[in-house]
A protein has these predicted regions:
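Local cysteine-cluster metal-coordination motifs and their immediate loop/turn environment
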Residues: 1-7, 27-38, 162-168, 262-275
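Iron-sulfur cluster-binding cysteine motifs and their immediate structural context
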Residues: 1-18, 30-52, 279-281
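Electropositive, gly/pro-rich neighborhoods at or near active sites that engage anionic ligands
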Residues: 31-88, 375-387, 391
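Portal/gating segments that form or line small-molecule/metal binding sites
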Residues: 87-96, 100-152
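Long, compositionally biased charged/polar accessory segments in the mid-to-C-terminal portions
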Residues: 101-102, 212-392
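A short alpha->loop->secondary-structure connector
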Residues: 174-192
């Protein structure tokens, strides 16, 4: 999307040169390298522009923020359908109304392969709630902006995404090019979701085919954090529906353990649980949904923990609260966040390795401490694994 000559396209998850383009010479252009967070997320420079300063060492993992609150959707249907309380979809839908936005980029599903993630553009606030579910699958998310930035002259919108998406977005916005100018002017509101590492589509396919015994062509819908099934509590289960209307379920902990085998070096070496470069950041209110899934229920009420980073983020939150869209209460950061610990441990491991890795958000920062083995972090008692039919 950042290429001024439009020489790059996506072949599924892989960027490739367009074979239908006569002029494949880049000359001195390095726009794609400048905006790619796989080389450097550019966090230090973006924070200077956004906040007037870069993060301190004690802000290494959460970044710069003004307020930390618990937040959840007050609409029962939105709250029930959501993976973690509906804070993201409720705030996004309200932002579209409050800021008079024309579109919102969210993560949806492919029409031809409903088990595959794909970017989706919502054109009105009511559409947002169709996508109020977690998605644990890689997809070229920002490709969803291609048409709105290149073809719609005046529209403004919002983006929900993961840390790497916003690092790339901020890189695009820093470009001295037409697409950079459009991205600066027309992306008006941003919400990021914390990420310990994303998963290849083969991870979802392994759950459907190997664990549930389904044929992919029979799958019509996939939910990663489904809490609408009878007898299922937060944090939900992995579920799939098939053409005959049957719903098939797996405990969430089994999904997480399967996903471990379907990662990329880029995700595993990523230095950021949160980019810190958005108006709002959100993660689960329960710091360890894996253990909650093993136990069958959470000790926490279903909600999201929200970091407010900008005045605009604060304004949208207060407006949504005053309008009765979300519930808000002050909170502290619960200890023992599994996603953050997995991210930190893998970063320690890869910083000591020989392969190239993305730069950390603080230049030259080296993560202290020891790496905790992921098998230890995702361990499950043998009797529970046997009861749930997990293969050794």
């Amino acid at each position: 999307m950042a290429c001024p000559k439009d020489l790059i396209e996506m072949d599924d998850l892989v960027p490739v040169a367009r074979v239908d383009t006569a002029d494949l010479t880049c000359g001195e252009c390095t726009d794609c390298l400048q905006m790619c967070p796989g080389l450097s997320p550019g966090t230090h420079a973006v924070e200077e522009r956004m906040f007037g300063r870069a993060r301190r060492d004690d802000e290494r993992w959460l970044g710069i923020y003004d307020e930390l609150v618990a937040c959840w959707a007050l609409d029962d249907a939105v709250h029930s359908r959501s993976g973690a309380g509906g804070a993201v979809s409720a705030l996004l839908a309200h932002a579209m109304h409050h800021l008079q936005l024309d579109w919102a980029l969210v993560c949806g599903r492919r029409g031809d392969k409903p088990w595959r993630a794909a970017p989706a553009i919502c054109r009105n606030p009511t559409e947002v709630h169709q996508y109020s579910q977690s998605t644990y699958q890689l997809t070229p998310h920002l490709i969803g902006l291609y048409d709105v930035l290149r073809q719609e002259e005046e529209s403004r919108g919002a983006i929900v995404g993961l840390p790497c998406h916003f690092q790339a977005l901020r890189g695009i916005q820093a470009l001295a090019s037409p697409v950079g100018d459009r991205a600066r002017k027309r992306v008006a509101f941003t919400i990021e979701i914390a990420c310990s590492s994303n998963t290849l589509p083969s991870g979802t396919e392994a759950l459907l085919v190997d664990e549930l015994g389904l044929e992919l062509q029979h799958v019509t819908r996939v939910f990663y954090r489904d809490a609408t099934c009878e007898g299922v509590a937060y944090p939900g289960v992995f579920s799939a529906e098939t053409v005959d209307g049957t719903r098939h379920e797996l405990p969430l902990w089994r999904a997480f353990r399967t996903f471990k085998r379907h990662k990329t070096h880029r995700c595993l070496s990523c230095p950021d649980w949160l980019s810190g470069l958005t108006d709002v950041s959100v993660f689960d209110g329960d710091p360890n949904i894996f253990v909650a899934s093993v136990n069958g229920t959470s000790d926490y009420a279903k909600h999201g923990t929200v970091l407010i980073r900008t005045p605009l983020g604060a304004a949208v939150l207060r407006s949504a609260q005053n309008a009765g869209v979300v519930g808000v209460r002050q909170t502290d950061l619960p200890p023992g966040n599994l996603g953050l610990e997995r991210k930190r441990s893998r970063r320690v491991l890869h910083e000591r390795g020989a392969r190239p890795i993305p730069e950390p958000p603080i230049p030259g920062y080296v993560e202290p401490g020891e790496c905790v083995d992921d098998d230890e972090l995702l361990s499950v008692p043998a009797d529970i694994r046997k009861h749930e039919g997990e293969a050794d």
